[in-house]
């Protein structure tokens, strides 16, 4: 009897711990949303975080976007050529990047680069008792430390997604026009005529904002709740990448389904 009872007790403790974590995360999320107007008033702090997070990720975003554009140009051309529609390569590359690959791949790279940096920074501040010292001085660490970083990630992510998509389109053009020989006029005219600014670009912007909010919040939450030890900070950075990546992929499916149903 003891083994089943022990197993049931462990299951109950795990469920209770999971629900407590969800509650604490929801409480932190609500506080960050409520504190956003006050955070925007600290423009310099937010601008510093946008620069820090964007600068952290710009190189890998640009290089990745270029190679994704190369691959899209090659794969798209040889696929469209089967149906005699190779002149639509520009439209295929643009829609693939703006609606889907731009926001998603940027969010995954953002989680691995900037997200882990945020988690490590907050975790080290916690292990060094800097957050506790702020509380001792009646300074709210959520408002002072977390909110500017939350806003910085929310702003930086759409900008990085735009850079990724723009560089990817240039990569697709380079392969399609310069390497394969697709007509440049057809490449750009198909893109110009087929991409809807409000529907296609707007949907991509919405995705990038949602992904930026998600990745930044996960990174801040993991750093703020980690164990104040080197091992705890290391585990928190790993959890940031795993949780944020899964959340981005799941939200991408939900948002895509909603956008196509409208």
Give the residues covered by each predicted segment:
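Hydrophobic alpha-helical transmembrane segments of multi-pass membrane transport/permease proteins
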Residues: 60-75, 254
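Membrane-interfacial helix-loop-helix connectors in multipass membrane proteins
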Residues: 75-98, 166-209, 213, 217-237, ...
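Final/C-terminal transmembrane alpha-helix of multipass membrane proteins
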Residues: 233, 239-256
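Membrane-interface helix starts
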Residues: 38-63, 242-245
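Loop-to-helix entry region at the N-terminal start of transmembrane alpha-helices
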Residues: 52, 56, 60, 64, ...
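Start (N-cap) of specific transmembrane helices in multi-pass transporter permeases
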Residues: 140-161, 236, 240
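Short cytoplasmic-facing helical segments at TM-TM junctions of multi-pass membrane proteins
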Residues: 122-147, 230-233
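Short, membrane-interfacial amphipathic segments enriched in basic
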Residues: 1-46, 222-227
